[in-house]
Amino acid sequence: MKKVVLAYSGGLDTSIIIPWLKENYGYEVIAMAADLGQGEELEPLHEKAIKSGASKLYIEDLQEEFVTDFIYPTLKAGAVYEGKYLLGTSFARPLIAQRLVEIAAKEGAVAIAHGATGKGNDQVRFELAVKALNPDLEIIAPWRIWDIKSREDAIDYAVERGIPVPVTKDRPYSMDRNVWHLSHEGGDLEDPWNEPKKDLYLLGVSPEDAPDEAEYLELDFEQGIPVSLNGEKLGPVQLLETLNEVGGKHGIGIVDMVENRLVGMKSRGVYETPGGTILYTAHQALEHLTLDRLTLHYKEQIALKYAELVYDGVWHSPLREALDAFVDVTQKNVTGTVRLKLYKGNCSLAGVKSPYSLYSEEFATFGRDGVYNQKDAEGFINLFGLPLKVRALMEKKSGLR
């Protein structure tokens, strides 16, 4: 019997895909659930997957690899999609697909299956990764094939086969959670005029419900990588979990946005990324202290392209690897300490220092100084403004002004 490896979460979509694959393809279904920080959500999956018809379930702890090999490179690049989205779902998919391909090789499977819909970005992210890593594998995307057209249809399909799902028609939110973020889509969020309900938030609280007293914290970075919190060395996963807890308490990192999907439509999502928001704020502050103007400005352009690559699912590509090489060079001196103030949804800079700081108080002071000769500015302005002057003279001579 041919085998297929399914990206399994235990949610509505992947729960009904197991019997659907068996009924329509006759394949043995091997499920794989990636532990990216869901924690207790994965505990009941073994029993559920088997009851749904899978022959076995792999639960792969990918948290450390997720943070060090996917989150940190994106953090160092400063990649943010459309100015808001910190890419929590986007860079998780290439890692999941990578492990699916590895398990397929181990099990001798001929196909990979996923539960991403035909309207979303995840189908692209999964399938581009599979094509890049093993183009011989068949890819099955049930949402593009079957007669199920809505989440309500999917719920009915599950109920008919006795499959329990953590979704009801009264609250049909689609959620994706990992150690970096929690996303919410669907339901009443599909109308962008609807304000998210306060009980939507699971990683933290609404800013107005946050404590009335601010909290300060200090983060140490080494070559662009966070290594300690308040002077205590922490592993990558522990550091992020701690920041999620602290940031969530203060309502940090809630993003409500309408974004442009790769597949051509706009969608509305509400994202909770407390720890990630803290790290991005701190990392950016340290870069502003340690990077020269030319490098910083060019890196900002690279960040836009990097964000698009990650969002579009082109992680396993020569361009992303080349951009990583550039970013790594820029991070050599991004070492130091950042102090942040957390207060009612705001994460603001309260201090930054680095042994590689390019900030010189002697040059920057508005007081008396003997370092900077202000007369030098006149020659610079004359040369820098020469093209503007020449154009103005031409326009005056030709009667254009």
From Swiss-Prot:
GO terms for cellular component: cytoplasm. L-aspartate binds at T117, N121, D122. Gene3D superfamilies: Argininosuccinate synthetase, chain A, domain 2, HUPs, Single helix bin. InterPro entries: Arginosuc_syn_C (IPR048268), Arginosuc_syn_N (IPR048267), Arginosuc_synth (IPR001518), Arginosuc_synth_CS (IPR018223), Arginosuc_synth_type_1_subfam (IPR023434), AS_cat/multimer_dom_body (IPR024074), Rossmann-like_a/b/a_fold (IPR014729). Pathway: Amino-acid biosynthesis; L-arginine biosynthesis; L-arginine from L-ornithine and carbamoyl phosphate: step 2/3. It catalyses: L-citrulline + L-aspartate + ATP = 2-(N(omega)-L-arginino)succinate + AMP + diphosphate + H(+). CDD domains: ASS. GO terms for biological process: argininosuccinate metabolic process; L-arginine biosynthetic process; urea cycle. L-citrulline binds at Y85, S90, N121, R125, S174, S183, E259, Y271. GO terms for molecular function: argininosuccinate synthase activity; ATP binding. Coiled coil: none annotated. ATP binds at A7, Y8, S9, G10, G11, L12, D13, T14, S15, A34, G115. Belongs to the argininosuccinate synthase family. Type 1 subfamily. Homotetramer. This is Argininosuccinate synthase. It comes from Desulfitobacterium hafniense (strain DSM 10664 / DCB-2).
